[in-house]
Amino acid sequence: MPRCERALPSRSIATMPAVFATGFLVGFLEWACLLVVKPHLDWPAEQTVGTHVDVSHEAATPPGLVVTARAKLVGVDGRKLRFEVEADDGIDLIARGTHERVVILRERFDAKVAEKAAAGSDPGRGGA
């Protein structure tokens, strides 16, 4: 399987159309979900992380338009939160879908990430 070893976009990204990119749109929708639940969490000890995204990017948005993201919490199953999301640019509905997040204890989460990072930097481990 090919590996992506670039941390920054290549020059080929510069040839992409000048529109609001899908990856940035998904991040913006995630942020809207966070704003919905943050007041109900013991922040910063409790936080949420995204676990699933099912979003259709339906229309291009050129520079200069204002994008508005909306998120509605539609389901809670233990620590799992399910949202309906959408975004518009004042002209078109540009995205709609669902997003799932899980409530985490930040300290515990950070400890697991640090453990994984240490294991990944072990030269005897091999890596992916």
Positions of predicted regions on the chain:
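Flexible, active-site-adjacent loop/turn segments at secondary-structure boundaries
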Residues: R6, P17-A18, P39, A59, ...
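Conserved N-terminal beta-strand and adjoining loop/helix that marks the start
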Residues: T22-V26
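HotDog/MaoC-like acyl-thioester-processing domains
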Residues: P62-P63, K72-A128
